[in-house]
Curated annotation (Swiss-Prot):
Pathway: Carbohydrate metabolism; glyoxylate cycle; (S)-malate from isocitrate: step 2/2. Belongs to the malate synthase family. It comes from the Eukaryota. It catalyses: glyoxylate + acetyl-CoA + H2O = (S)-malate + CoA + H(+). One of its GO terms (biological process) is glyoxylate cycle. This is Malate synthase, glyoxysomal. A motif (Microbody targeting signal) lies at residues 565-567. The keyword Methyltransferase does not apply. It is found in: Glyoxysome. One of its GO terms (cellular component) is glyoxysome.
Length: 567
């Protein structure tokens, strides 16, 4: 058993060298910074490299399996339950008991790994803060490395933020939320770190650096002997969950901590994964603390999965809520599966932002939040997500009024009738209409989000909602689907085809964006670049899997031109 930090490297020379000290085969191409170097230590990089070398072929195979599944769906196949794993779905087994530290997860707040956000979220009164390296973060080198620094300071309890504009210093309260961290998905590379000549896997960098620097402190201060805790995004099947389980076991072994110390909640946010929830649990049964309804990404995945199916066109995305039969079925089956296996079933995001200058609109927004959370807690969810500290009190009141002092509903709400849900229930076509305003909203929100992402912001307030990459993705794929199949806008009496008006809509929405943000900000921002990327993706003959994979090429900066590490 090898304790982390005992790889046997000699102490670095006191001579100042403006390059990262790296183990063999590792090449850092991001900008050198002395603060970053405290994260990118030789031992930490060796740990990441060990993970990359052991699991890269498994990851590549999993990505090839995704391509093969996409080919089948495009040829007319439908996702469904796997007959070969029926014994797992029908078996009477449970995941290991959840740690006492996370028994109560009534309200969780999410946000990027930015310094002020971390402090405000941990102080918000929420039970959990999910610090995000994924959809709420633009993965620039600066954001990723500063995020690791910020989390290390947060785990140690020393994090502060001096807001000079407000003449205020932010620091942690005595009581704070439990910290979960969401690394990137399997598909995203980290192009600033090369291992053996190829880009590292983004999630292994996020997980590896965070785990290496924080596991010991976290277990003492936050986890009550368990942890660290994670959220795992974008998985499509149990094969991908098995890789994560192996990563966790390797990390635990190398750190010399008990098997099952690391715990993770999996986001069910792809359509194929809803048919594999039991199987995902089975692979992660020693490390699982539940599932979460990632509903925006789930709708995005519905379109992506059925990109070759002209009979499964979505209405305006605003009409695809949790009352649609296929969405309610997904939620009910998730709750039933989680509680049957003894773990938490987490509800979806409340993305509203308090509207301070309009009390009437603000109350209407909060009423929407209350209704959504009331639906979730009545359905049996054990907790929910909020994107803004101002929503925590409202969400907490709804869950507490329904649950009392019980920390969760795992034993009290079983949703057994959901065992009768069929593949048809989970795939039922959504109902609704398509409108010009739906097309316009998708266009301007998609472009504005992408413009912010390209300039370093992954969590973006737009029209009183806190948006992340999932919103841009659903906006993009919905327009792509409507264009590909020549959809008619049937909801507002116009009767025009999207293909005939999209070019004009883009021009008019760009003009509207310029009016709304102001000419100076529009000129300095990357709105025109974002518009080119977004419209190219919407009009492409084949649908790209992820908008952020394409856009990532625009934010990768190598310093210096050749190499930034001491080999």
């Amino acid at each position: 058993m090898i304790g982390l930090g005992s790889y046997g490297y000699t102490a670095p020379s006191s001579k100042k060298i403006n390059a990262y000290d790296v183990p063999q085969g590792v090449d850092i191409r991001g900008r050198f910074d002395e603060e970053f170097a405290k994260i990118l230590t030789k031992d930490a990089l060796q740990f990441v490299a060990d993970l990359q070398r052991e699991f890269r072929n498994h990851i590549k195979y999993a990505m090839e399996c995704r391509k093969e599944a996409k080919r089948r769906y495009n040829e007319g196949a439908l996702p469904g339950f796997d007959p070969a794993t029926r014994y797992i779905r029908e078996g009477k087994w449970t995941c290991v008991p959840f740690p006492p530290a996370v028994a109560d997860r009534r309200v969780e707040i999410t946000g990027p790994v930015e310094r002020k956000m971390i402090i405000n979220a941990l102080n918000s009164g929420a039970k959990v803060f999910m610090a995000d390296f994924e959809d709420a973060l633009s993965p620039s080198w600066e954001n990723l490395m500063r995020g690791q620094i910020n989390l290390k300071d947060a785990v140690e309890g020393t994090i502060t933020f001096n807001d000079k504009a407000r003449n205020r210093v932010y620091k942690l309260n005595n009581e704070i939320a439990k910290l979960f961290v969401r690394p990137r998905g399997w598909h995203l590379p980290e192009a600033h770190i090369f291992i053996d000549g190829e880009p590292a896997t983004g999630c292994l960098v996020d997980f590896g650096l965070y785990f290496y620097h924080n596991y010991a402190t976290f277990r003492n201060t936050q986890g009550q002997g368990f942890g660290p805790f994670f959220y795992l995004p974008k998985m499509e099947n149990s094969r991908e969950a098995k890789i994560w389980n192996s990563v966790f076991e390797k990390a635990e072994k190398m750190a010399g901590i008990e098997k099952g110390s690391i715990r993770a909640t999996v986001l069910i946010e792809t359509l194929p994964a809803v048919f594999q929830m039991d199987e995902i649990f089975y692979e992660l049964r020693d490390h699982s603390v539940g599932l979460n309804c990632g509903r925006w990404d789930y709708i995005f995945s519905y379109v992506k999965t059925f990109q070759g199916h002209p009979d499964r066109l979505l209405p305006d995305r605003g009409q695809v809520g949790m009352t649609q039969h296929f969405m309610r079925s997904y939620s009910d089956l998730l709750i039933r599966t989680c509680h049957r296996r003894g773990v938490h079933a987490m509800g979806g995001m409340a993305a509203q932002i308090p509207i301070r200058d309009d009390p009437t609109a603000n109350e209407a927004a909060f009423e929407l939040v209350r209704k959504d959370k009331q639906r979730e807690v009545k359905a049996g969810h054990d907790g929910t997500w909020a994107a803004h500290p101002g929503l925590i009190k409202t969400c907490m009141e709804v869950f507490t009024n329904n649950m009392g002092n019980t920390p969760n509903q795992i034993e009290t709400v079983k949703r057994d009738y959901a065992s009768n849900l069929t593949e048809d229930d989970l795939l039922q076509r959504p109902r609704g209409v398509r409108t010009m305003e739906g097309l316009r909203l998708n266009t301007r929100v998609g472009i504005q989000y992408l413009a912010a992402w390209l300039t370093g912001s992954g969590s973006v307030p737009l029209y009183n909602l806190m948006e992340d990459a999932a919103t841009a993705e659903i906006s993009r794929v919905q327009i792509w689907q409507w264009l590909k199949y020549g959809v008619e806008l049937d909801g507002d009496g116009l009767g025009v085809r999207v293909n005939h008006v999209f070019g004009r809509v883009v021009e008019e929405e760009m003009a509207r964006i310029e009016r709304e943000v102001g000419k100076e900000k529009f000129k300095k921002g990357m709105y025109k670049e974002a518009c080119k990327i977004f419209t190219r993706q919407c009009t492409a003959s084949t649908l790209d899997d992820f908008l952020t994979l394409d856009a990532y090429n625009y934010i990768v900066i190598h310093h210096p031109k050749d190499v930034s590490s001491k080999l």
